[in-house]
Amino acid sequence: MVRIVVFILLCVRFSAPAEHCNAQMKSGPWRIKSLPIAAPKETLQKDVEIEIVETDLDQNVVIGYKGYYQAYAYNGGSLDPNSRVEETMKTLDVAKEDLLMWGIRQQCEVGEELIDQWGSDSESCFRNMDGRGVWVAGKELVKRQNNNHFAHHTCNRSWRCGVSTAKMYTRLECDDDTDDCKVTILDINGTSINVTENKVLHRDGVSMILKQKSTFSRRTEKVACLLIKDDKADPNSVTREHCLVDNDIFDLSKNTWFCKFNRCIKRRSENVVKQRPHTWRHDRPPKHDEGATATKGDLMHIQEELMYENDLLRMNLELMHAHINKLNNMMHDLIVSVAKVDERLIGNLMNNSVSSTFLSDDTFLLMPCTSPPPHTSNCYNNSIYKEGRWVANTDTSQCIDFNNYKELAIDDDIEFWIPTIGNTSYHESWKDASGWSFIAQQKSNLISTMENTKFGGHTTSLSDIADMAKGELNATLYSFMLGHGFTFVLIVGVILFLVCMLRNRPSHY
């Protein structure tokens, strides 16, 4: 009997592992916690059918202007109340046929320059008021007010004109009910003006007409859209809907036409769009067509792009989080299954020296254990790590030093798709269009010539320095010399007469 007891003790001694667990200090019961898997608020919907209507960003507009300055004067002397200068400054509307011909010839037609027409010639001020017969590439008027012909009328008339085929920006507008679209021209403030190929528009001192009729094209495409649901309680509600069209981002949240510059886009929405955040409300006018200086519309569109990128990033993070939680729950099931065979698995995963004992399929107890210190061999004292356990070992030939181990890659690193900002197209301010620059320049030229000319233009001549009309200085000097010469002769004659009288007087002695 004693031999049997000794044999059992020896077996226990040589078979005991290098670690021991205390069954008296069990804790629990425990159950691995499952992680919640939440669906993202963002949904990426592919193959969304949209309709795109597009026109040219700008159109060729023929712009022309014509006018004249006229001074009809009468010189009756300073004592005559009828002495006056009647000034007329008039801008003429250019007819459609004339404007089209101007555009073809790149010349404008005016009347003959009338310079210092006096006497009967001054009647020219009442003829050829429409300005015909002289073709020029463009000219500015010269202000003349000659009135130096005594007791006569004087006429001066000078013409101005110009023509240019320039670009003006367009805006495409589509009706939400009928889907009819039209192209309008934008003025310097970005406001639509009625410039067509059939009728001349007269405004701002110029006449303008479209060189050819504006056209637009329609096409249907399938694109990808990102749907944002801010209300998790209502899965059918959509707050924003970003669609990627030709590498550009558009907000198509409502079943209406979204028009930006020269393009309109519309989709048939199946979702209920709720009220959007205060900075993005559909009941306010769209901000993408506010073509102010620095193109505010482009800046607003960049903000739309940033919102899209933020929503897309948030969707990717939420999808990743949900997927990781799903993988974690699958890993939990796998750990529970393996831990029923390897009682130290759960402790090793928690980096604690504990052992598990299962009470049911997913409930277990934990007990503290002792572990050998870190080592670089599969042997420790009289134990060997074998088949996932520390067991007794008497054969030292089975010990292996794994200090110089090698790593074996069994999977690849994940490559993420990094989103980038869309290909935003930038637009100049409306007032930067060449057509409005031409109009502004002709106004500047008119102001300059009216300020700097009076008698045909300032030069270095004495008449211009004295601010006198042509011939007026000559007449003044002639009158001055003639008057003073007559006075001189008269005085000399009187003196000679007196001298003669004194000499002929008889002497009395």
Curated annotation (Swiss-Prot):
Alphabetical keyword list: Fusion of virus membrane with host endosomal membrane, Fusion of virus membrane with host membrane, Glycoprotein, Host cell membrane, Host membrane, Lipoprotein, Membrane, Palmitate, Phosphoprotein, Signal, Transmembrane, Transmembrane helix, Viral envelope protein, Viral penetration into host cytoplasm, Virion, Virus entry into host cell
Any one Gene Ontology BP term: symbiont-mediated perturbation of host process
Residues annotated as glycosylated: N156, N189, N194, N351, N381, N423, N474
Pfam family, one: Baculo_gp64
GO CC terms in record: host cell plasma membrane; membrane; viral envelope; virion membrane
Signal peptide stretch: 1-17
Domain of life: Viruses
Protein's cellular compartments: Virion membrane; Host cell membrane
Keyword Signal: yes
InterPro entries: Baculovirus_Gp64 (IPR004955)
Bilayer disposition of the protein: Single-pass membrane protein
Post-translational modification: Palmitoylated.
Record field: transmembrane: 480-502
Primary residence: virion
Lipid anchor positions (O-palmitoyl serine): S479
Family under the similarity heading: Belongs to the baculoviridae gp64 family.
Main function: Envelope phosphoglycoprotein which mediates the fusion of viral and host endosomal membranes leading to virus entry into the host cell.
UniProt name for this protein: Major envelope glycoprotein
